[in-house]
Amino acid sequence: MDERLVSTEADNHESAIEQSLRPQTLSQYIGQQKVKDNLSVFIEAARMRQETLDHVLLYGPPGLGKTTLASIIANEMNVQLRTTSGPAIERPGDLAAILTSLEPGDVLFIDEIHRLQRSIEEVLYPAMEDFCLDIVIGKGDTARSVRLDLPPFTLVGATTRVGLLTAPLRDRFGVHARLEYYEQRDLAHIVSRTAELFEIGIDLRSAEEIARRSRGTPRVANRLLRRVRDFAQVLGNHSITEDIAEDALERLQVDKLGLDHIDHKLLLSMIEKFRGGPVGLDTISATIGEESHTIEDVYEPYLLQIGFLQRTPRGRVVTREAYEHFQMEVPIRD
């Protein structure tokens, strides 16, 4: 798969950059107003009762700030944040070691929690409900179960695929918060804030131009800003102007709607070779040289979101809106 500027996933280098940009409090966090308002109430109530915050499940598309919110929750509760991920916990003993090392009130953040194995999930159930850990000592006839008390803690789970969580695990979270794609004005505010942290000037129109092409995702907005900053600095500018932003984004092949060269390749292949569809997923895969699951999981979601692609029982279909975006005549379908 080609490297994409508009990918919503982060690599290791980018994760380190994101950490340096993260807001530390709910008041600094831009966007997701309903989620922020509710979390603010739950956090304040827990502090007033001098209790741990109820377990929190954050879900939604990647790149929207779930990890940042977990860090903010810990900061607002004035406790330590412990971070791990579903794939990193390979055995029940790995999770037991993490749980027994927690201090009272700590926030344990598990990213990609939907990827936990079932046997590991079962260790979490008593830990989440009763703050205890059931372990088996010995084998065979001599085996016996021992219950260890755990300090009260808050589990924050994050997932991009909430439907893959088992019902018993999902139901043990007292707070469920879905993160939505960002409004353009909030993304422009994020771009301006990041530019200030990068110590480079940017005007409102330039911030809005970057925001417009960011697919509603802060991670994409910050990545595009970094690349536009490169163009500005090489040109000898200490500030990003609208002309520089537009020129840089066009050279980076990110169009006005945030579509990149791979999106264009997929849509134009369907239009030019199959009259816009319907086309089967395997056929599209063979035509553009990408794996079917990559098309389905990586490329299609945004095209579906903006209404450029439809899934039908007979296959994928390019919509009128996509034809109009490419300034092409819409075919008359049978």
Swiss-Prot record:
Acyltransferase as UniProt keyword: no
Superkingdom in the source lineage: Bacteria
Head domain (RuvB-H): annotated segments: 256-334
Recorded catalytic activity of this chain's protein: ATP + H2O = ADP + phosphate + H(+)
Chain intervals for the UniProt region annotation (Large ATPase domain (RuvB-L)): 1-182
Stated role: The RuvA-RuvB-RuvC complex processes Holliday junction (HJ) DNA during genetic recombination and DNA repair, while the RuvA-RuvB complex plays an important role in the rescue of blocked DNA replication forks via replication fork reversal (RFR). RuvA specifically binds to HJ cruciform DNA, conferring on it an open structure. The RuvB hexamer acts as an ATP-dependent pump, pulling dsDNA into and through the RuvAB complex. RuvB forms 2 homohexamers on either side of HJ DNA bound by 1 or 2 RuvA tetramers; 4 subunits per hexamer contact DNA at a time.
PANTHER family xref list: HOLLIDAY JUNCTION BRANCH MIGRATION COMPLEX SUBUNIT RUVB, PTHR42848
Protein name: Holliday junction branch migration complex subunit RuvB
Record organism: Bacillus pumilus (strain SAFR-032)
Gene that specifies this protein: ruvB
